[in-house]
Amino acid sequence: MEVVPAEVNSLLPDDIMDTAITLVDEDSIEAVIVSSPIPMETELEEIVNINSTGDSTATPISTEPITVYSNHTNQVAVNTTVSKADSNTTVKPAFPSGLQKLGAQTPVTISANQIILNKVSQTSDLKLGNQTLKPDGQKLILTTLGKSGSPIVLALPHSQLPQAQKVTAQAQPGDAKLPPQQIKVVTIGGRPEVKPVIGVSALTPGSQLINTTTQPSVLQTQQLKTVQIAKKPRTPTSGPVITKLIFAKPINSKAVTGQTTQASPPVVTGRVLSQSTPGTPSKTITISESGVIGSTLNSTTQTPNKIAISPLKSPNKTVKSAVQTITVGGMSTSQFKTIIPLATAPNVQQIQVPGSKFHYVRLVTATTASSSAQPVSQSPSVNTQPLQQAKPVVVNTTPVRMSVPFVQAQAVKQVVPKPINSTSQIVTTSQPQQRLIMPATPLPQIQPNLTNLPPGTVLAPAPGTGNVGYAVLPAQYVTQLQQSSYVSIASNSNFTGTSGIQTQARLPFNGIIPSESTSRPRKPCNCTKSLCLKLYCDCFANGEFCNNCNCTNCYNNLEHENERQKAIKACLDRNPEAFKPKIGKGKEGESDRRHSKGCNCKRSGCLKNYCECYEAKIMCSSICKCIGCKNFEESPERKTLMHLADAAEVRVQQQTAAKTKLSSQISDLLTRPTPALNSAGGKLPFTFVTKEVAEATCNCLLAQAEQADKKGKSKAAAERMILEEFGRCLMSVINSAGKAKSDPCAMHC
């Protein structure tokens, strides 16, 4: 037997001294025998109260063993004392842990006062009535079931609970404001015929036991063998509240929302949405049906500058200023703006009437021009017709509506709108003829033809534009197209806005036609770490995209155009002539090509592809800074290497042509139908080998194999017989073909 430590005895009441811990087996526990019936609810005499401030009343006590065991691996037996005072005696032990009140315990008389307690898992909760008993820690509250007794609080350490063989009784000073102590809920029972106890004490955050006096304990049995506190499933006191929101589709709602991007169907052109007297602001209400839940309906109040005016003859004053812009493309902010042409062929004029605070916009439509429009960013198409009277028409773009009048005009004056960004490019002319304003869509730009440009010229757009772009062209191209920042307008009537870019014919330079120079395949690059965005990448330096190269992690393609443009700009900032061809014409009057800056070879003798002159198959000139150069006309090494290089190139071309011809012939044989007749009109021999002939031949071969097996021939003899039979079959096929060739009529009969 193991003795309880001294700190345990010091925390227990003074009248309890004989306490020990004994490890017993579960098989040694005897059944609990109830000697007397349990009294009913009406037979309860009193409620035992425990007051923390009162003193304990000493009564004659006797020591009785109480066996406590757990469902876990270890079993603990505690010998404690049970007072045998009368039922009227009030026991008030002083507990510093803040226990103020103990619930009414049901008096149960058990022989030998043996009580079996089962420990509940930490995840279980016990709820009775409105009280919820939640285990928060490892503290055990044990009470005897006599008519009067002293409860014992056993606090088990967290780290030693599964392996503990000692019970430490701990009593801590209580404080009402401290967080709730960790209490371990225990159950009494574990035997068959379990009867639950209805009235159970609950713990408050102040570590107090409050009696559930509203519903006293009631036992519905006459005989009790084991008492167990029923384990209830955990019921949270406060759960999530589910709110169901039903959104109904608005039908006739006219709610006004200030800052909401509306999505409405296109408004029919020419529809009068407001009727008001002049001088008062008109209010246009557009009701749109949307399938998206939560969409709102906007009511747009038009400002007085959208009042329709009467037809004007000719404006008194034309102000050259920026045209009113509206947002497009579904943008909720107004930072992206562009000019929206309302029709294909109007001229926009902003009119300022002297002495008037209103701003008017007049659109003059041509009589013979078509009225199809192409707004920017996939706006709804608007078809406009010249109107005799000025009527407000709402042109529906996605976020903004603008009402403008259409009037007939007799005189036309030049108006040049200020472009907002690089995509809005509109220029008008001063000729009093039909005007055609190009829509601000990314159409192919009409670019002029520029001649007499050196090959490899780097082109930049006109200064003043926001976006700076570079067009790097290979050295073999002669035509250099300059990007213009405007769109020219044709004065004739048969002008089409979809004309392509015009290019000039390629001219021979340095005695070599571009088609001849491009016939030579470009050497693939082998870049690994430069992303093909450095000048030592031949593809990047020549202004070409990588194609069929051996590079890794390549950015020199259309998928990484932004990074490529940044690298080009960085190279041009360091050297404006970085992308110009290094092999160009010599001085005037010279037809030979020469290096523009010269090579700087030191150890290769200018006879390897490291030398740019040798790679271009030109000789080094006086401007080269090479050392030990052998790349001159009289050099035998150069002649030998050049001949070898030419021979190797010719051999590669021949091999490529042979492979191409062979593959084409094979594909031709596979796709070409098999001719059944020869040139003389006879049937070819292989056409006699049909499916039936093949099956008959196989049967003959199998028959020879079976015959050789029956005769007990050796393997070699059997193979000889099969081959001889196969030869006879082939000879019969050939003889049949010969007979058919000699007698053509037999083939047709």
Curated annotation (Swiss-Prot):
Any one cellular-component term (Gene Ontology): RNA polymerase II transcription repressor complex
Main localization (coarse): nucleus
Binding positions (Zn(2+) 1): C525, C527, C532, C537
Domain of life the protein comes from: Eukaryota
Residue positions binding Zn(2+) 5: C599, C613, C620, C624
Site positions for Interaction with DNA: R574
Functional description taken from the UniProt entry: Component of the DREAM complex, a multiprotein complex that can both act as a transcription activator or repressor depending on the context. In G0 phase, the complex binds to more than 800 promoters and is required for repression of E2F target genes. In S phase, the complex selectively binds to the promoters of G2/M genes whose products are required for mitosis and participates in their cell cycle dependent activation. In the complex, acts as a DNA-binding protein that binds the promoter of CDK1 in a sequence-specific manner.
Name under which the protein is recorded: Protein lin-54 homolog
Organism encoding this protein: Mus musculus
Lineage start: Eukaryota, Metazoa, Chordata, Craniata, Vertebrata
Originating gene: Lin54
